[in-house]
């Protein structure tokens, strides 16, 4: 039998079982757990495109026509991809049919090859992923819709779904993620047609009677946002959650920093055990001072972080005060405004936030775009936090001296499957699984989490790192992110989703508003609990000292040092 050295094999076909890769310049090492391309019975039946390679007529490419059946040829095949997802770290071919993932396994020509479950035919396009990591598109569930250019930045970072509220650079939007009222919701849904991004909008949830809240849900809001700047009282919380229970949408909350209408215990009591998504759960982004982080221990609370406090570094505290003053329309000349801002910034709780992420007690990551957070850094900050925790805390249960697979799965779930579950869209997006929308992000391992090579939306290339369009080949400088054909014309509307409430979809608001994008309803939200947060469902007993701000989880003091240096930073950004 012919053999090939392991390194030569990896360079030709990508890594296989037992091979290890470093993620960017972090201390995180993955190890390939399985190789689905071996379903042919072993090595030797791999497919690869190019001169002298195997995807040629009568070889790895057969004669079958494209169609909907498993025996038909797929529209596009991604060869030899290294999939990194919450469910595993595996090598596989990926077949795309229409906008969705049709199969994950072994591609080729079943007329001459064994074990083929992805058929390559004359109508099949090829994307070569040898040596590349492929992840599900990220989901950012905390967007202030302050400017549409955020979407360009987010897409270029590997985010393919953005959820939040706002109407542009309005004062209310600067501070709160709310698109208030049916008219504003309609305008934002119409604007969404222009962007190669899955979008969903939050209505304003601050009301003590349900009529105006229900009106926003009927108009298309996929969630309601409770924000202290509008008055997050126990009455408003109870009313908002009652409407959510009736309409199967999510409620996101930014609680009462000043403790004017109650303390954290009063807010938890107002939840009445109902599911809720708590934004910036550490508290620097807002929430009961100093102990909002107690909600991490509640079974019905789905906690997330925003990225300005991720991870805790020597610069974190210094940058927060000015950010906070601007975002919440505060005046540094007013003593009460300054005290309000300073009450939210606590080194002890920010340090504990790092550890709670590593324990799987904070379930999600998001940006808080242009409202103290950076829309293009959700993915980067997630992996910087994972790196810092490995360096400071060592291995997680399930990891070994060879790999950090358990930690990698925990952290990737924070911006993929868990926000999808929390917001009722995991049937469409959030992971690389058969039947789901083909939002896929391709990374060179050295650039993982920092700069993707290619972004697919709904099975079609929407963005790529592309060289000079006038060059003789695609690679000459300057290489930068450029929109591809999936970002234009009718292809855009066919390859991206707009999420609506079930009530709005049933009422056919798409026709009434004149929408062109594919529409999908959120569902199954009210039954989601903390235990459903994949790899991130821990509910420790939380204690926070009101005087010292020290944080304990299950009696253990949570503290760590700020990072002096981080990976995935200046080495990658010269300009």
Swiss-Prot record:
<dbReference type="InterPro" id="IPR032466">
    <property type="entry name" value="Metal_Hydrolase"/>
</dbReference>
<dbReference type="GO" id="GO:0009039">
    <property type="term" value="F:urease activity"/>
</dbReference>
<dbReference type="InterPro" id="IPR005848">
    <property type="entry name" value="Urease_asu"/>
</dbReference>
<keyword id="KW-0378">Hydrolase</keyword>
<dbReference type="Pfam" id="PF01979">
    <property type="entry name" value="Amidohydro_1"/>
</dbReference>
<dbReference type="Pfam" id="PF00449">
    <property type="entry name" value="Urease_alpha"/>
</dbReference>
<feature type="binding site">
    <location>
        <position position="280"/>
    </location>
    <ligand>
        <name>Ni(2+) 2</name>
    </ligand>
</feature>
<dbReference type="InterPro" id="IPR011059">
    <property type="entry name" value="Metal-dep_hydrolase_composite"/>
</dbReference>
<keyword id="KW-0963">Cytoplasm</keyword>
<feature type="binding site" description="via carbamate group">
    <location>
        <position position="225"/>
    </location>
    <ligand>
        <name>Ni(2+) 1</name>
    </ligand>
</feature>
<feature type="binding site">
    <location>
        <position position="368"/>
    </location>
    <ligand>
        <name>Ni(2+) 1</name>
    </ligand>
</feature>
<feature type="binding site">
    <location>
        <position position="254"/>
    </location>
    <ligand>
        <name>Ni(2+) 2</name>
    </ligand>
</feature>
<dbReference type="GO" id="GO:0043419">
    <property type="term" value="P:urea catabolic process"/>
</dbReference>
<feature type="domain" description="Urease">
    <location>
        <begin position="137"/>
        <end position="575"/>
    </location>
</feature>
<protein>
    <recommendedName>
        <fullName>Urease subunit alpha</fullName>
        <ecNumber>3.5.1.5</ecNumber>
    </recommendedName>
</protein>
<feature type="binding site">
    <location>
        <position position="227"/>
    </location>
    <ligand>
        <name>substrate</name>
    </ligand>
</feature>
<feature type="binding site" description="via carbamate group">
    <location>
        <position position="225"/>
    </location>
    <ligand>
        <name>Ni(2+) 2</name>
    </ligand>
</feature>
<dbReference type="InterPro" id="IPR017950">
    <property type="entry name" value="Urease_AS"/>
</dbReference>
<dbReference type="InterPro" id="IPR050112">
    <property type="entry name" value="Urease_alpha_subunit"/>
</dbReference>
<dbReference type="InterPro" id="IPR006680">
    <property type="entry name" value="Amidohydro-rel"/>
</dbReference>
<dbReference type="InterPro" id="IPR011612">
    <property type="entry name" value="Urease_alpha_N_dom"/>
</dbReference>
<dbReference type="InterPro" id="IPR029754">
    <property type="entry name" value="Urease_Ni-bd"/>
</dbReference>
<dbReference type="GO" id="GO:0016151">
    <property type="term" value="F:nickel cation binding"/>
</dbReference>
<keyword id="KW-0479">Metal-binding</keyword>
<feature type="active site" description="Proton donor">
    <location>
        <position position="328"/>
    </location>
</feature>
<feature type="binding site">
    <location>
        <position position="142"/>
    </location>
    <ligand>
        <name>Ni(2+) 1</name>
    </ligand>
</feature>
<comment type="similarity">
    <text>Belongs to the metallo-dependent hydrolases superfamily. Urease alpha subunit family.</text>
</comment>
<feature type="binding site">
    <location>
        <position position="144"/>
    </location>
    <ligand>
        <name>Ni(2+) 1</name>
    </ligand>
</feature>
<comment type="subunit">
    <text>Heterotrimer of UreA (gamma), UreB (beta) and UreC (alpha) subunits. Three heterotrimers associate to form the active enzyme.</text>
</comment>
<feature type="modified residue" description="N6-carboxylysine">
    <location>
        <position position="225"/>
    </location>
</feature>
<dbReference type="InterPro" id="IPR017951">
    <property type="entry name" value="Urease_asu_c"/>
</dbReference>
<comment type="pathway">
    <text>Nitrogen metabolism; urea degradation; CO(2) and NH(3) from urea (urease route): step 1/1.</text>
</comment>
<keyword id="KW-0533">Nickel</keyword>
<dbReference type="GO" id="GO:0005737">
    <property type="term" value="C:cytoplasm"/>
</dbReference>
